[in-house]
């Protein structure tokens, strides 16, 4: 009798455990479906640890994006090419990038809608131990950059400005901003293209600036979305609300100053307090608008120039 009772209790325990396990699996499946539904409804934007993304970071922190149906998710990447891939493979609907890369994606078949022009600029920073102080000294030197990007176009500009044969300018593809900084610090490269706040970090380490893209007058930073996705009514409405939130964030930054968001920049861009303290004090952020025709023509002209050389 005692053995029978033990066996019965063991059977009941196994059944209870089995039900609990099946119930857990069912709940987990429901949670996964719900998470996937929310992710699908959210407007996903690929961002980088750079200052041109600050209005988006501020909009998120100040809860300006909460009015968007489905919400907004900022997905951090370390390289522009990874943002491109995420957009092409429909992992995100939009990205912070540059006009060269956006126009190239558009030409390849991923039609683009521009939301904003950012205040991004790039500085060509030489290794302080390389003794490079002028552009003309770049002959047979290695420059860290990203192919088919603003830094590629600017490298051509730099070479043309001193009639330097571009074949003697060794453009090394370093997509990750962190890798560029590490190679500069480890004296493994002669010069690199950097945007803020990484450019300020390099200057703090006494690496000299030999070219600044602002001298060209070009405005190449953009926030772009997949046109096909934005044609959907729900997405189009989300984009309208995003523009409103973005503009409010720009106003907040311009009113309070970039350094007011010191902790946010340190967290998102992974830089020290000293870097934020040393950022230029005149940084301003414009309301959302499309790229200028002259900038698009410049990018298109350089592309045609490259094709004619092949």
Placement of each model-derived feature along the sequence:
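Sec-dependent signal peptide recognition
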Residues: 2-8
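Secondary-structure end/capping motifs
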Residues: 232-307
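C-terminal motif of bacterial Sec signal peptides marking the signal peptidase cleavage site
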Residues: 15-16
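Short, glycine-/small- and polar/acidic-enriched structural segments
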Residues: 21-165, 171, 183, 190-196, ...
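Repetitive helical segments and hydrophobic/amphipathic motifs
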Residues: 11-12
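Proline/Glycine/Serine-rich low-complexity intrinsically disordered segments
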Residues: 129-136, 154-155, 159-161, 166-170, ...
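Pocket-lining segment of extracytoplasmic ligand-binding domains
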Residues: 99-100, 168-172, 176-265
């Amino acid at each position: 009798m005692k053995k029978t009772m033990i066996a019965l209790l063991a059977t009941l325990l196994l059944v209870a455990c089995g039900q609990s396990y099946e119930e857990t699996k069912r709940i987990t499946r429901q949670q996964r479906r719900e998470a996937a539904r929310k992710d699908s409804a959210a407007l996903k934007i690929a961002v980088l640890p750079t200052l041109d993304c600050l209005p988006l970071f501020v909009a998120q922190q100040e809860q300006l994006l909460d009015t968007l149906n489905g919400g907004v998710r900022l997905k951090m990447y370390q390289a522009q090419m990874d943002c491109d891939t995420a957009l092409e493979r429909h992992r995100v609907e939009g990205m912070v990038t540059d006009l060269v890369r956006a126009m190239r994606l558009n030409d390849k078949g991923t039609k683009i809608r521009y939301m904003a022009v950012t205040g991004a600029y790039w500085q060509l920073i030489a290794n302080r131990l390389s003794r490079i102080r002028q552009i003309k000294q770049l002959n047979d030197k290695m420059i860290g950059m990203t192919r088919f990007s603003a830094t590629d176009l600017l490298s051509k500009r730099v070479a043309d400005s001193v009639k330097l044969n571009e074949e003697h300018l060794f453009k090394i593809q370093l997509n990750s901003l962190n890798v560029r900084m590490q190679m500069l610090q480890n004296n493994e490269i002669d010069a690199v293209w950097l945007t803020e706040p990484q450019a300020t970090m390099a200057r703090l380490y006494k690496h000299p600036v030999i070219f600044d893209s602002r001298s060209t007058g070009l405005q190449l930073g953009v926030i772009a979305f997949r046109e096909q996705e934005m044609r959907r009514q729900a997405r189009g409405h989300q984009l309208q609300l995003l523009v409103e939130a973005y503009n409010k964030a720009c106003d907040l930054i311009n009113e309070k100053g970039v350094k007011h968001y010191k902790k946010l920049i340190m967290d998102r861009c992974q830089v020290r307090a000293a870097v934020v303290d040393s950022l230029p004090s005149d940084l301003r952020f414009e309301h959302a608008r499309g790229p200028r025709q002259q900038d698009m023509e410049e990018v298109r002209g350089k592309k045609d120039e490259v094709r004619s050389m092949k």
